[in-house]
Amino acid sequence: MGLVGKKGCCGQQRKGKGIMNNKKNLKMKPVGSEYMEQYNALLRYVFQVTEQELSSIGWQEREIIRAKFPTMEKADVIGWFDDDNLVSQVAVYPMQARIFGRTYAMGGLTGVGTYPEYSNMGLMHKLLEQALKNMKEHGQDICYLYPYSIPYYRRKGWEIISDKISYEIKDYQLPKNHQVPGDVRRVDTEGEELKAAYNRYAMRTHGAILRDDLAWNEYWLGDSDDIMAAVYYNENNEPDGYVIYWIAKEVFHIKDMIFNNEEARTGLWNFVAAHFSMINQVEGDTYTDEPLAFLLEDASIKEIISPYYMGRIVDFVSFIEKYPFKPSVLDREWKFKLIDPVMECNQGNFSLTISREGCGQVVRIMEPCQDEINIQTMTTMLMGYKRPE
């Protein structure tokens, strides 16, 4: 999707061509690592990232390219080319996500962009369609993305599946210290302790992404060198949570805090509150249903709830075969018409049967159905973000 921003392409002036000439020369194909600089330049243009902004966090253009190179080699990147110039692109990272205790192959959609002079030509729709077909071939039954335009992705079949809560806590509102059996240890941000803590958390958390080296590389990309981490270990010396943070201008910034239980949550907030004399407030984001204000003695903190990830079922039949429905004393059946604006394999009339044990099966049917649902609603419902009324 094209975004009209500042003139030029990261210092490069785009050649002015007519729309008809563009169409004649355009070709969709995989984007190899030899196009890494063009790939990065297009992202920089679309998201309006300047050299000054990169330098402010200690990054240089070449460092970004080197950091992105291993990720791009493993990703499925496709784009439109005008002769040999990359003008529109999407990237899909091979990932895994935990969905109600099951591990699903997931496609992480990112790197989406089109130069403005090539917008309104249907290029991105065709790229997304091909990317989804590739995901289906790779067995990736669901796709996650972090949207810059919720309405646009809704039209293509994605829907909100999680929220982000941004909060501000004044120093005098920090929770009081409470005794816990474990302890908090500061660790190397690139060490195995942090990964072990996250793996324990992700395996038991619905919707969490299982991070391999590729995912960790993306997670850290763009962070400053000042970022730090601390892990909470329980009395059995098992990592039950962590906080990733940095301190600047008397503000304790929390990039991420995860915990498996109340003990770990308390221990990590004890650690944050121990910085009381160094800071004026704490700012951070949380991506869970944690009732943060409720858990504080002074609950009058600032919280802003905003959409976070969007998700999309890629292959409905395959997704249902793996999905753990709740057991019941009765077999269940639902007949409905499913609508998908992009994937033909998901369009049509279906019968969903669920056994008493919670195993689902979907078959196509020819008979007309009174109920109708689109893939967006089906996704957010099965992901547990919204329940049917």
Which functions belong to the PLM regions below?
Residues 128, 133-147, 277-287:
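Conserved GNAT acetyl-CoA-binding A-motif
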Residues 9, 20-37, 48-50, 181-389:
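Intrinsically disordered, low-complexity, positively biased terminal segments
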Residues 77-79, 85-95, 108, 113, ...:
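Conserved beta-strand in the GNAT
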Residues 109-133, 262-273:
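Conserved acetyl-CoA-binding loop-helix of GNAT-fold acetyltransferases
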Residues 13-14:
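Cationic, low-complexity basic patches in intrinsically disordered or flexible, solvent-exposed regions
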